[in-house]
Amino acid sequence: MALWRTNDSKVYLPPAPVSRIVNTEEYITRTGIYYYAGSSRLITLGHPYFPIPKTSTRAAIPKVSAFQYRVFRVQLPDPNKFGLPDPNLYNPDTDRLVWGCVGVEVGRGQPLGVGLSGHPLFNKYDDTENSRIANGNAQQDVRDNTSVDNKQTQLCIIGCAPPIGEHWGIGTTCKNTPVPPGDCPPLELVSSVIQDGDMIDTGFGAMDFAALQATKSDVPLDISQSVCKYPDYLKMSADTYGNSMFFHLRREQIFARHYYNKLVGVGEDIPNDYYIKGSGNGRDPIESYIYSATPSGSMITSDSQIFNKPYWLHRAQGHNNGICWNNQLFITCVDTTRSTNLTISTATAAVSPTFTPSNFKQYIRHGEEYELQFIFQLCKITLTTEVMAYLHTMDPTILEQWNFGLTLPPSASLEDAYRFVRNAATSCQKDTPPQAKPDPLAKYKFWDVDLKERFSLDLDQFALGRKFLLQVGVQRKPRPGLKRPASSASSSSSSSAKRKRVKK
């Protein structure tokens, strides 16, 4: 039985329609032309803990650590200015060509090894795992020389836009509630571009250690005055156009080796309801409860390597399926499994029969070796009105590089033309040279890799190209050998001779 009742619920209207983000496969036509491109051997060398400033007798030494990001900005040639094997491949009036990345291999040299990091004045007080008795709050400096093997990380991010990282930094305070000296400042999660040379999370957290740790001894030397960033996978995965991360490879491993508490005073006391007070013997007042662990990356094996392997991109995690806008590609790498630091000793005096430490000096260096290889597919875009409007909304510089813009009408005004230009009596008539377009990423630091002259159609001449041909099932045509082929007459006579032997 149907009963009528008054409407006691709210009326919800549908949300306003928004423009739809389309996948690149909906407006891009892929051709059957593939190119191989590879870099040379990329080597960097420096001090693993801090940069050495320049002096009058020595050049500056950069900081090169296995716990830094390596962000390669790969420059690609403009396919619209390329000498193509098929001139009828596209119509320059209505089409444009772009590169699509379908294969990548990041090569790593140098042996596997563990590089230690540490601090000669590390802020550790008690061993809180095997503590025998509480010692009370110490007032003297008991910092000690401590080294750790940091968290093990292997990472590779592929995209056509710079990667995004996150870390904890000092937040802004309200004007009516200032922070007194000695109080904990407010924190905020900061998102920023990951640049080449930025420090990774080594197991002590992703934060601005230079701004948030005044003791300068709570973490190892290589990060005590740095900002450790962690890739913002959530933000890059939610990228509207999917340019920051086509896909990524990641392997992290860590466990806690030692457990300590900190030496300095505690800013926030434990509430009395949380414990029963001690009766002396070093238990009143109680010790610091600011605990910290030293990380360890554990064992390193070749079975767990993500580098020196080819990877094929069939479907990206975002809307950009490997299209390299602005003819550039960003490769972000981290590999702590090859973190061995080279120790070098030199003699300051003649070597004596007995060992004298003052006669020698010790130095430490770290080197890295990379190689980048790619397989690119030539793709075509038909520039309809909808596609051009979509690309302009995504990135206006794409159409500017394709020479699309407003055409100014011819000038109808009368212009001046001097006869004698190069003399002191006439005003200078030299035109101001046009300024180059500013690079929107010039303020960031990347490792530039120029591949504009390293493209090749002969895929079977390169290791990654042969792997790609095997992957897609294309067989190479055998080349004619040096042996001269047999003539038809000799082959017919030999076959007839064989038939005669059979008749006998």
Curated annotation (Swiss-Prot):
Feature: compositional bias, Low complexity: 486-496
InterPro entries: Capsid_L1_Papillomavir, Capsid_L1_sf_Papillomavir, dsDNA_vir_gr_I_capsid
Ranges for region Disordered: 476-504
GO molecular function: structural molecule activity
Record flagged with keyword Acetylation: no
Keywords, in A-Z order: Capsid protein, Disulfide bond, Host nucleus, Host-virus interaction, Late protein, T=7 icosahedral capsid protein, Viral attachment to host cell, Viral penetration into host cytoplasm, Virion, Virus endocytosis by host, Virus entry into host cell
Family: Belongs to the papillomaviridae L1 protein family.
Record text on subunit structure and interactions: Self-assembles into homopentamers. The capsid has an icosahedral symmetry and consists of 72 capsomers, with each capsomer being a pentamer of L1. Interacts with the minor capsid protein L2; this interaction is necessary for viral genome encapsidation. Interacts with protein E2; this interaction enhances E2-dependent replication and transcription activation.
Cited function: Forms an icosahedral capsid with a T=7 symmetry and a 50 nm diameter. The capsid is composed of 72 pentamers linked to each other by disulfide bonds and associated with L2 proteins. Binds to heparan sulfate proteoglycans on cell surface of basal layer keratinocytes to provide initial virion attachment. This binding mediates a conformational change in the virus capsid that facilitates efficient infection. The virion enters the host cell via endocytosis. During virus trafficking, L1 protein dissociates from the viral DNA and the genomic DNA is released to the host nucleus.
Record protein name field: Major capsid protein L1
Annotated organism of origin: Human papillomavirus 51
Lineage: Viruses, Monodnaviria, Shotokuvirae, Cossaviricota, Papovaviricetes
Annotated gene: L1
